[in-house]
Amino acid sequence: MTDKYSSNLVPVNIEDEMKASYLDYAMSVIVSRAIPDVRDGLKPVHRRIIYSMYEAGNHASKPYRKSARIVGDVMGKYHPHGDSAIYDSLVRMTQDFSLRLPLVDGQGNFGSMDGDAAAAMRYTESRMSKVAHKLVEDIDKGTVSFNINYDGSEEEPSVLPAMFPNLLVNGSGGIAVGMATNIPPHNLGEIIDACCLYIDNNDIEILDLLEVVKGPDFPTGSMILGISGIRSAYLTGRGSIIMRGKAEIENIGNSRQAIIITEIPYMVNKARLVEKIAEMVKEKRIEGISDLRDESNKNGVRIFIELKKDVVAEVVLNQIYACTQLQTNFGVIMLALKDGLPKVMNLKEVIAAFVSFREVVITNRTIYLLNKARDRAHILLGLAIAISNIDEIIYIIKASNDTNLAKQELMDRQWEVLDILPLIKLVDDKVMLNERGKLSFTEVQAKAILEMKLQRLTAMEKNKLEQDLKHLATEIAEYLNILDSRTRLLEILKEELIKVKEEFAVPRLTAIEFGEFDQDIEDLIQREEMVVTVTLGGYIKRVPLSSYRSQKRGGKGRSGLSMRDEDITMQVFVGSTHTPMLFFSNIGKVYSLKLYKLPLSNPQGKGRPMVNILPLQENEHITNIMPLPENQDEWDHLNIMFATAKGNIRRSDLLDFKKIQLNGKIAIRLDEDDKLIDVKPCKEDEHILLATKAGKALRFPVESLRIIKSRISDGVRGMKLAKEDSVISMTVLKGINSTKEDRDAYLTVPWEKRLKIAKGEEFNLEALGVHLNADSILEMANSEEFILTVTENGFGKRSSAYGYRITDRGGSGIINMDINDKTGLVVGVMPVKMDDELMLITNSGKLIRCKLESVRITGRNTSGVILFKLDDDEKVVSVSLIAETSESGEDSELVEDGLESAENM
């Protein structure tokens, strides 16, 4: 190769070039072809067709024009991608079986439900439909931005100022690179009602929107079976909706019946459906049909299926549902472009995006109209000044040699305005008066004066001028009010939506059938105790509790799970397959899930990422999981207590979290440098114990905190922390009625004796040597709780909860454990029972279970004993308790009776 050409060559890595080029191609397909914009619900080709028809005057009130002319205009001005793609898009916009509200009014053959192709574009004619005008209304008032077209000769709108949520009303479908969208059509009236509800309350729950948006409304009618698919689609943006055609059974004499299909599912080819039924009859997969014919006409669908004598029609119909597309699924993927990027959105997010867009449109329109009104008022003020000084105006004009000199002389002169000063103030004109209360004409005003007709000098015209100025003043005041008041702007938005509804809303075509289609599958789930493990990397799994064997204290443990990429266990708890769980995330959101929906694994398995199970946002991860009682009747008297690392706490009603949609809800507001440590159910007569990693603890009554209804509150100060210290655990304890003196006296009784008293063993009051009576000792023994404290270096101890005195929240607390370099920092604090077992997990994935009865009971201010032999650089990261309910022994089978969990984040 000569130097002439080699000097222009730039060597590149072919792998990098292919990646970059393919990414460019993918984004081009996503943004410029296949995915609709959430604001107007249109892809670029549809937007260009409608705008081109609008610009060409091909309106609903005008005569039809040849489709070929429309396609040519679109291709020549905006869309240089071939006429067939443009015409196919135009054809679909005319089909009343494809769009709920067709955007193009067609005349001629535009295809059919049988899959027939439309006639050539030279034969068909089109014009905008009436509802399409609502997509372009106010487009000439500065409402949306315009872009240069492909050759720089024209401008086209980046989006249409749609007055109704077209994305939901007409739906959309498309396949891009690596993604697809499939949004069903809806009823206009229902969608606008949902928009109005959102305008009235931006915090409305999606389930409340479902009260008005019953589900998709397909242009072909048919039925939707069940609401589970609808709920999933609206809550998460993805779902599968079961569609079923409508059929009637008629008696035709001689003990014979016929099935009449009158509606078919959306996007099902009717001719292929009939062929499929015939094929199934031929293969004898459907039996009992003697005749089949398509009797459909312009009045609607009618597929006649004649049955043999004495055949049960319901059985045949069910066979047709099972074997053909008379019953099929619509896979919903509510993917659309938001801020130029593809995003899967739920129902509320789509509505919110549309409402936000309409706010911008109305604001831009108001600014445009305000400027126009002010410009007009400015000219009228000039005319008013001229009429007030008409003699001098005429003299100047007559004395000038030409128009330019007259205009300049008018602009140079200072004019009295005292007579019209009220009009100037009325229209809020920004003129600059000099010290003597005079002003000069602007060039615009001077030009208008020179063009003024003599008839404007009459008294009637003067009065009309004043009335025009007053009218403009009213308009200007209204425009300023709209710009200053979001409330007024939303009122206008809502009024315009309601007008569209009144003009174009039609009855629902698609019925929704409830019943066995939404049958709960939980009855089929076998009850089994599971160990749920969550890793810091966001992986979760459930393992049958029987997979773990019991070991004695001091053992080396077994491999609990395979740790990859230095992932460590964050949380472990035990529950039934039917246990409901609340998942709390680092950004303060809460999600709800039943335990059986978690991935089943083995002790060495890693599980699945929670982002594949819950609809987590970018940079969002689960920090806490709270198992709840299976019986929701028990929730009525429970509260939820939140605790954060910075020592904040909040008490809320558990019932506030009873109805949580699939995409979650806000649970608590967190500061940027704070994180959620624990969330637990509690009762009013119970106590809260906060513990820190530095070995401090603080106990206070639940009733000392008021219930906070706001889910966006960050709560109140629970504990004052030292520098570098943080809360690592929150424990719920029983309330106590005894005095501190009585508790101190009780604690002088040896713990072995206290345990025996609690088990019912008789005791000698005098031998105990305390001033308490027998009833008090017995009551305190039966109510005594023990607090387990575990450190990162494997040390642990049990202490009586009576040793933690009750104080006011907000204090610094008392010593919980004597920590040092040998013990390390505290990682877990929780109440335990005598027959509990301890489960510890280290950052290397090692797991051990040991009997708590072998863990020494000591006072608060002690360091405890070694619970777990650790290797170098090994730390305890998770502590859980499992209560034994079956026979004891080293390899006993264990089930859950109570559970607490703590983690080191």
Swiss-Prot record:
SUPFAM superfamilies: GyrA/ParC C-terminal domain-like, Type II DNA topoisomerase. Its EC number is 5.6.2.2. A motif (GyrA-box) lies at residues 551-557. CDD domains: TOP4c (cd00187). Residues 35-524 form the Topo IIA-type catalytic domain. GO terms for molecular function: ATP binding; DNA binding; DNA negative supercoiling activity. Keywords: ATP-binding, Cytoplasm, DNA-binding, Isomerase, Nucleotide-binding, Topoisomerase. It catalyses: ATP-dependent breakage, passage and rejoining of double-stranded DNA. It is found in: Cytoplasm. One of its GO terms (biological process) is DNA topological change. GO terms for cellular component: chromosome; cytoplasm; DNA topoisomerase type II (double strand cut, ATP-hydrolyzing) complex. The active site is at Y123. It is an enzyme of class 5 (isomerase). InterPro entries: GyrA, GyrA/parC_rep, Gyrase/topoIV_suA_C, Topo_IIA-like_dom_sf, Topo_IIA_A/C_ab, Topo_IIA_A_a_sf, Topo_IIA_dom_A, Type_II_DNA_Topoisomerases. PANTHER family: DNA GYRASE SUBUNIT A, CHLOROPLASTIC_MITOCHONDRIAL, DNA GYRASE/TOPOISOMERASE SUBUNIT A. Belongs to the type II topoisomerase GyrA/ParC subunit family. Few gyrases are as efficient as E.coli at forming negative supercoils. Not all organisms have 2 type II topoisomerases; in organisms with a single type II topoisomerase this enzyme also has to decatenate newly replicated chromosomes. A type II topoisomerase that negatively supercoils closed circular double-stranded (ds) DNA in an ATP-dependent manner to modulate DNA topology and maintain chromosomes in an underwound state. Negative supercoiling favors strand separation, and DNA replication, transcription, recombination and repair, all of which involve strand separation. Also able to catalyze the interconversion of other topological isomers of dsDNA rings, including catenanes and knotted rings. Type II topoisomerases break and join 2 DNA strands simultaneously in an ATP-dependent manner. Heterotetramer, composed of two GyrA and two GyrB chains. In the heterotetramer, GyrA contains the active site tyrosine that forms a transient covalent intermediate with DNA, while GyrB binds cofactors and catalyzes ATP hydrolysis. HAMAP family: GyrA (MF_01897). NCBIfam families: gyrA, PRK05560.1, PRK05561.1. This is DNA gyrase subunit A. It comes from Rickettsia typhi (strain ATCC VR-144 / Wilmington). The lineage of its organism: Bacteria, Pseudomonadati, Pseudomonadota, Alphaproteobacteria, Rickettsiales.
